[in-house]
Amino acid sequence: MRAFWQELEAGPVLQVHQAGEVPYRRAWAWQQVRLAQMIRDPQVPDGLLLLTHPPVYTLGAGADPKFLKSLAGQIGSPDTQPESPVTEGPEILRVERGGEVTYHGPGQWVGYALLNLKRHRTVYGSHGQPDLHRYLRHLEEVLIQTVAHFGLQGERIPGLTGVWVQGHKVAAIGIKVSRWVTYHGFALNVCPDLAAFQAIVPCGIPDRPVGSLVHFCPEVTMAAVAPVLVKSFCQVFGLQAQEVSLSEWLGERKSLKTQG
């Protein structure tokens, strides 16, 4: 992975931490730590957290619970522990991001992008400020370039957010921005259990099926996709990846390398 990233030209640093399977609440807390640091200190580099989650359903801040269909369970919040232990099925959490309900689980790469948009002129609009629609299109481009590496043509659908392959949605995006620092991000279906999506109306879109890369490219693996995602992210945003430990990503200790 390091060698693959090193093919990139030098640019501002993107500190990348690739974790294994991380519970949603824990990953959410990691984002809050990094977000607070980036708001407090504009010199903190951009960061990308790449991981998978155990099964969980999340709703955006304004999501309609009707898209949970018949899914039963208390809707919780990532900043509070459930009143009683979850014994059956995935948790259901309402979070700050935009968008409707989605599913996260094994076989899906989730990327949490913490970027200071003030540093990214390519997402600026004509009004001289960062444009969140442009940022969303940049995230889509990351995913389109990623699937293209595996011989697949990723597509946008006007009026919707995400990436489709042959009419199947393979990537979902949901973001939140605080003082021009982004958090939350994207989810790319590599080889998840798609049956988990049948319990909901994914992203509130009833007439668009969900798909996965392995359906179109049977030999694809999670391990093969991860470095391509990172490289595509860096190419689209003009950054250079720097692999860091979790403690470095959280700012608990300084990285030995702070500039690419």
From Swiss-Prot:
Gene Ontology BP terms: protein modification process
Any one cellular-component term (Gene Ontology): cytoplasm
Source taxon at top rank: Bacteria
Residues covered by the BPL/LPL catalytic domain: 42-241
One Pfam family matching this protein: LplA-B_cat
GO MF assignments: lipoyl(octanoyl) transferase activity
Function, in words: Catalyzes the transfer of endogenously produced octanoic acid from octanoyl-acyl-carrier-protein onto the lipoyl domains of lipoate-dependent enzymes. Lipoyl-ACP can also act as a substrate although octanoyl-ACP is likely to be the physiological substrate.
NCBIfam families: lipB (TIGR00214), PRK14345.1 (NF010925)
Protein name stated in the entry: Octanoyltransferase
